[in-house]
Amino acid sequence: MIVIVTGMPGSGKSKIVKEFEKRGFPSVSLGDIVREETLKRGLELTKENVAKVSIRLRQELGQNAVAKLAVEKVRALLKGSQVVVIDGVRSLDEVGTFRGAFPEENIIIVAVHTPPRQRFERLKARGRHDDPQTWEDFEERDWKELRFGIGGVIAMADYMLVNNGSREEYEAEVKKLVDEIISKL
């Protein structure tokens, strides 16, 4: 089984990924693949360089470029695990790449929605090199994600978590969701 986790930046995707990992299931981050590719090209890990490499990859390999680069990692992990989690799918082209590469696997899409103001505050506090520090940067990043097609992936989700309450409430919802998905094995 492949579980695709999607949502806008700062929505709470990593909590779902970590819950699967705590239960022994591996994950592949498409964002990490872009960051690795940035370093391979001899570039410093800055917001601008990562964005440029992301765009270049899509120009060189198509809109599903990052998913194509992830397929072999996912294939290798599936040899040793009943579930592999993929974090950071941003377009239906990428979903299609995984469906095409793994026709025998049950592919489940989980989306997380969190109100924009909450996401902005989380991203500011997270402090990763590519996280926005101003509302304008945040909105620009959101529009970029939407242009990539993340809205289509969210719309096609098999499960939708709304993360607008307390941390404890969300963590309980995540555990319940992971229990439900694992019960389908």
UniProtKB/Swiss-Prot annotation:
Q: Which domain of life is it from?
A: Archaea
Keyword terms of this UniProt record: ATP-binding, Nucleotide-binding
Q: Which residues bind ATP?
A: 7-14
Q: Which SUPFAM superfamilies does this one have?
A: P-loop containing nucleoside triphosphate hydrolases (SSF52540)
Q: What protein am I looking at? A: UPF0200 protein TK1334
List the InterPro entries: NTP_hydrolase-rel, P-loop_NTPase
User: What's the family?
Assistant: Belongs to the UPF0200 family.
Q: Which Pfam families match?
A: AAA_17
- UniProt entry tagged with the keyword Ion transport: no
PANTHER family under this entry?
Answer: DEPHOSPHO-COA KINASE, UPF0200 PROTEIN MJ1399
Which GO molecular function, any one, fits this protein according to its record?
Answer: ATP binding
